Every structure is written in C-alpha cells, then in structure tokens.
Amino acid sequence: MFGPITVPYEAVMLYNVCKLKEGVEWSEDLEFAIGEMCNVVRSTYDDFIAGQVLKYAGFVSEEGSVGDYGPEGNHFALITYWKSFKSHEESHRADLFLEAFGGVLDYCSEAKELGYEIMWQGEN
C-alpha cells in the first residue's frame, strides 16, 4: 500500500485537485474516507494501474513558478493511472464508486479532475 508504483508509458494519468470546505482540516476521518474510496478503485477496476494521494504541504516554488499565483488554499490531490480514459470514466459512473467518492466529497467544496497522456518519464 505504501510501496513504489510502476507506471507503463501507455497509461493515462488523472489529476484530481480536491479543495477542502472552509474550516475542514486534514483528519483521520478524511483520511479514512479517501482510503475507502481508494480501496474500492484498487480492488474493483481491472484497468486501474496505480494511484497516489498527496496532501498539500503549503508551499509554492518561486524557482519553478512563472506568472501570478495566489494562495492555493487547503486541498489535496488524487493522482490515478489507468489503461485508458474510457475505463476511468466508466468506473466513475458506477454506483459503488459514486458512493465511495461521495464520502470524500463530504469534506470538499470542489474537485476538478484533469486527464493527461504521458509524454516522458524516467527515474534515477
């Protein structure tokens, strides 16, 4: 569960930024809701490859940022890798997923999920 992941080059990556509601902080309850959702995805959908949950650490790189940016607010990111965008979308229409994701959305004011194709990857 906390080990390294391997991502095939052909995979698509979905990047979901989940902004927490005003006054909501990272908590065991939120972490449990995210874990429940991740477990549903991992154990149910064959075209799911891997995923990561990232808690915003509160800093913005001045060296790596260009242009205007403001406070990012309290949020977390869900990064998932799938065999296809179509498989991802089908999974997210299923009642089982919608119920689990609803548990996460109880803590969120908004969520936006963007899809990406891998153009380069490497490791050291």
Residue ranges and their predicted role:
Residues 1-98, 107-124:
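Short S/T/G/P-rich N-terminal loop/turn motif that feeds into the first structured element of a domain
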